[in-house]
């Protein structure tokens, strides 16, 4: 009623001024959000948290919530839970929040959470190893998890998006990129496709008033199209803007930029089964031939920090704790020469036994800077005599799994749970180890990290593990990224977060009206 009254007053005032208007014609607030971070090729399309990385979308777009979440300092806090206690090394007792309902209408209790977690570990690729769940007891609002072995990071992992609590009685409606679920979040998905999600506010949300009535999430595969949509007003906010497009919106009163440092990193894996890449001198030469400082300053426009290893300097086990090679074209050429690679025919590329040194660089387009990184590396590696053939494809996952590459460059949030373990268990020794890197000591240390409770010891193990993979030249790390959300200035309640899990929240609010296709900002609070 209040919104309709104010809308009517404003409409009348503008009609007196002779201006045509369309002011919240249905009395509702709406918000259109554009992103390059939602797609089938990224593995996060659909809203089923038990499928690949779709839990990220369930959390980001306000449909799902986890038992625990991370604050701005990446410290674990209760969310759907209110407390927890380690009874012993293999038993944790969790108290659940009272008064929470799924969007299906079912009350969330320990039995519902048990059903959800049991389905998760039955079907997910990472969760069983991370959580080590043996069995679960449910009693009212008390959930007791028993693990097969000590699992110090279980509370952190229960904040991973795959841990979004959904109603298994409601089940999963649809498949893959069209999957819909009943969560506990501030929004309910009415329609889900691999390219768009239509949301309405949850009128019975346990966490208070939800301010915006309808939200549309639109996926953009093309960065230029995303930028244009923000400029024309087709969308009101975005995550995933090309970094070289930020100057269009900086120091511009028509937009607001909110950003923060994250552990998201552009990094590469060498294919250890590739004959060329089995030569460590070649791997090291590739690393020494990439100008990380130049990439961060020129391509990233200063919104990235050169990376030594998996974690940024804000972590005690981050960049400053490890050593690796730096940009050194002359040193790279010497390494290649040591392995018999020289330019015998004067074409600018080194060769051996009549074969030019050519590497297959696999990447994908939805992380908009990755193709640019490929082009940048193509140019700098040419300077040391290496030919780079870029395969920039949305089908990168299929190719990565097949092993048809020499270098696979992707991006990941290396510490999304505020703990170092995730990167090693998922990417170095786990399912995302597409380069088939094998090192018994690294596997042993990863297992040790998985069972270590002491935080200082966990940090030491993280440093040792990073140094091992750097010394083996199995991975290389290019840049740690800042996360930025760009919105129209009448949009409030959207903030960048270090783990990039949280986007559409109950705090989101919009104040606007359209006047002859121009937005008149209403600087007031209802």
Predicted features along the sequence, with ranges:
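Surface-exposed binding/hinge segments that line
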Residues: 85-89, 93, 128-170
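Aromatic- and charge-enriched surface segment that lines or borders ligand/interaction sites
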Residues: 82-123, 276-278
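N-terminal lobe/hinge region of extracytoplasmic solute-binding protein
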Residues: 34-87, 182-183
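Detector for C-terminal structural segments
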Residues: 196, 289-319, 369-378, 400-526
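Structural transition elements
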Residues: 306-344, 365-371
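Ligand-site clamp/hinge motif
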Residues: 203-248, 387
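Gly/Pro-rich hinge or "lid" segments in bacterial periplasmic/extracellular proteins
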Residues: 53-54, 75, 159-210, 214, ...
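Ligand/substrate-recognition segments at binding pockets and active sites
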Residues: 342-414
């Amino acid at each position: 009623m209040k919104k309709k009254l104010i809308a009517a007053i404003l409409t009348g005032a503008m009609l007196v001024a002779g201006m045509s208007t369309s002011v919240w014609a249905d009395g509702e607030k709406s918000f259109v959000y554009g992103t390059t971070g939602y797609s089938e090729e990224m593995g996060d399309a659909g809203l089923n948290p038990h499928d690949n990385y779709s839990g990220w979308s369930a959390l980001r777009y306000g449909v799902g919530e986890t038992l625990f979440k991370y604050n701005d300092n990446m410290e674990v806090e209760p969310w759907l839970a209110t407390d927890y206690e380690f009874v012993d090394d293999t038993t944790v007792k969790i108290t659940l929040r009272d008064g929470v309902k799924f969007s299906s209408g079912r009350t969330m209790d320990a039995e519902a959470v048990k059903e959800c977690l049991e389905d998760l570990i039955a079907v997910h690729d990472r969760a069983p190893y991370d959580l080590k769940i043996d069995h679960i007891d449910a009693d009212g609002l008390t959930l007791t998890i028993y693990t097969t072995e000590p699992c110090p990071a279980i509370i952190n992992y229960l904040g991973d998006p795959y841990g979004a609590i959904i109603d298994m009685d409601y089940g999963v409606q649809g498949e893959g990129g069209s999957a819909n679920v009943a969560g506990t979040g501030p929004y309910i998905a009415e329609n889900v496709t691999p390219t768009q999600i239509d949301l309405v506010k949850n009128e019975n949300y346990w966490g208070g008033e939800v301010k915006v009535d309808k939200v549309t999430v639109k996926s953009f595969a093309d960065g230029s199209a995303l930028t244009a949509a923000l400029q024309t007003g087709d969308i009101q906010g975005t995550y995933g803007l090309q970094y070289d497009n930020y100057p269009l919106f900086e120091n511009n009163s028509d937009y607001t930029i909110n950003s923060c440092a994250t552990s998201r990193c552009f990094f590469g894996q060498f294919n250890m089964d590739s004959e060329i890449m089995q030569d460590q001198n070649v791997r090291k030469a590739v690393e020494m031939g990439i100008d990380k400082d130049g990439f961060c300053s020129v391509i990233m426009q200063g919104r990235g920090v050169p990376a030594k290893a998996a974690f940024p300097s804000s972590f005690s086990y981050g960049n400053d704790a490890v050593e690796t090679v730096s940009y050194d074209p002359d040193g790279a050429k010497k390494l290649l020469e040591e392995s018999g690679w020289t330019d015998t025919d004067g074409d600018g590329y080194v060769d051996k036994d009549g074969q030019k040194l050519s590497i297959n660089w696999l990447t994908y387009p939805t992380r908009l800077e990755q193709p640019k990184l490929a082009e940048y590396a193509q140019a700098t590696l040419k300077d040391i005599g290496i030919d780079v053939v870029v395969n920039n494809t949305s089908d990168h996952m299929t190719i990565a799994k097949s092993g048809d590459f020499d270098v696979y460059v992707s991006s990941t949030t290396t510490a999304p749970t505020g703990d170092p373990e995730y990167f090693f268990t998922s990417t170095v020794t786990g399912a995302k180890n597409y380069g088939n890197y094998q090192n018994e000591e690294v596997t042993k240390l990863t297992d040790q990290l998985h069972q270590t409770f002491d935080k200082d010891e966990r940090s030491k193990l993280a440093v040792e593990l990073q140094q091992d993979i750097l010394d083996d030249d199995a991975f290389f790390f290019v840049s740690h990224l800042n996360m930025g959300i760009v919105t129209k200035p009448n949009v409030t309640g959207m903030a960048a977060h270090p783990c990039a899990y949280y986007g559409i929240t109950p705090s989101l609010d919009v104040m606007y009206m359209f006047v002859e296709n121009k937005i008149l900002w209403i600087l007031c609070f209802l």
